[in-house]
Amino acid sequence: MQPLGERIVVQREESETTTAGGIVLPDSAKEKPARGTVVALGTGKLLDDGSRADFQLAAGDRVLFSSYAGETVEVDDTEYLLMREDDVLAVIE
């Protein structure tokens, strides 16, 4: 999947399946983590002079994003988030 413009594709990290006390959580009780890995970048934001801005992110970066960021897209049984670069809050090092 190749995003357009200033959009990026992020693969969300898997959520924990058990609690610290050993209780197995059903899918309905799991919170989706707001962390993931950037897998693809668009062409960059179009600037007023017609050029494209460089991304501050790179493919492979682990990122923290707003829990309401992006649109969920499923490709080949894998779930991805399609979001704007501005939705990313931080890079996890």
Swiss-Prot record:
Keywords assigned by UniProt, alphabetized: Chaperone, Cytoplasm
UniProt xrefs under Gene3D superfamilies: GroES chaperonin
GO molecular function, one term: protein-folding chaperone binding
Pfam families hit by this protein: Cpn10
Disordered as annotated region, ranges: 1-20
BP GO annotations: chaperone cofactor-dependent protein refolding
Top-rank taxon: Bacteria
Protein purpose: Together with the chaperonin GroEL, plays an essential role in assisting protein folding. The GroEL-GroES system forms a nano-cage that allows encapsulation of the non-native substrate proteins and provides a physical environment optimized to promote and accelerate protein folding. GroES binds to the apical surface of the GroEL ring, thereby capping the opening of the GroEL channel.
Protein name: Co-chaperonin GroES 2
